[in-house]
A protein has these predicted regions:
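Class I S-adenosyl-L-methionine
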Residues: 1-104, 115
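C-terminal edge-of-domain segments
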Residues: 214-224
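Conserved small/polar residues in nucleotide/adenosyl-binding loops
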Residues: 225-232
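Conserved anion/nucleotide-ligand pocket segment
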Residues: 143-186
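Generic beta-sheet signal
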Residues: 3-7, 73-77, 128, 153-159, ...
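Accessory alpha-helical/coil subdomains and C-terminal extensions
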Residues: 170-208, 213
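Class I SAM-dependent methyltransferase SAM-binding "motif I" and its flanking Rossmann-like core
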Residues: 85-153
Length: 235
């Protein structure tokens, strides 16, 4: 019996990958993941067997890794950012069920909120909330409730999955919810393609964020009341 290692590879660059993640990928027999994430590591580990699945096929991806482990292989399931924060770790455990085999190891990684904050300056310097705007698995009513309470609590908010082709207006809807409790002058930031080709970031207000163009490769921050501009924005 082999094992499944669920590996958080960080935002994209090798420099942002942990030593533990690198060692896990060096030691495995096969690397499984969403095609975009597999492409980020394929060049550095050319001797591995690679298995890719498209977007929305997370269960198939995890089942494949478990099948490889049952066949005696060490399968690394790669996840962007951290393996447990919107990653595949929970689903791998769920699909394995109550059995203790195959063995599962979870390797953490640098999540997008932290790497985006490093680009933008120091927007996460105090308490903060991380909220995904994807309603594929979470009802929008639940997301709206979380946004409302985070705004009322005056937390800095990191927004994951702000938009995609199937939900292009979700960030605008989120901003409308936040604007019920926050001023349109509230400092915000957008980081895109963190650690990858075309990396970029910009600072803007909440009012401007409502009209901004974003995609699934963006991470958004909305600051709390007392964060000063020179703390938030990289020079």
């Amino acid at each position: 019996m082999g094992k499944v290692i669920v590996v958080g590879i960080g935002p994209g660059s090798y420099e942002d990958m942990t030593i533990r993640a690198d060692r896990a990928l060096q030691s495995c027999d096969a690397i499984v993941g969403y095609g975009v994430y597999v492409d980020l590591v394929k060049e550095r580990y050319p001797d591995k067997a690679f298995y890719e699945t498209p977007m929305t096929q997370e269960a198939k991806r995890c089942a494949l890794a478990l099948d490889l482990a049952r066949a005696g292989k060490t399968a690394a399931m790669v996840c962007s950012g951290d393996s447990g924060i919107y990653g595949m770790a929970a689903l791998v455990y769920e699909l394995r069920g109550e059995s203790e085999e195959p063995e599962i190891e979870v390797v953490p990684g640098l999540t997008a909120a932290c790497s985006a904050a490093a680009l933008l300056g120091a927007p996460l310097t105090h308490d903060f909330a991380v909220i995904s705007l994807s309603d594929r698995l979470t009802p929008w009513e639940t997301i709206e409730k979380r946004l409302t309470h985070a705004a009322k609590a005056d937390l800095t908010i990191a927004l994951y999955n702000p938009a995609s082709r199937s939900r292009p207006a979700h960030l605008k809807r989120a901003c409308d919810i936040l604007l019920r409790d926050l001023p349109d002058s509230r400092l915000c930031g957008i980081a895109r393609n963190i650690g990858r080709a075309g990396e970029s970031w910009r600072a803007l207000t909440l009012g401007e964020l409502r009209e901004a163009e974003v995609d699934m490769f963006c991470t958004v921050t909305v600051s709390y009341t007392h964060l000063r501009a020179h703390e938030t924005l990289a020079n």
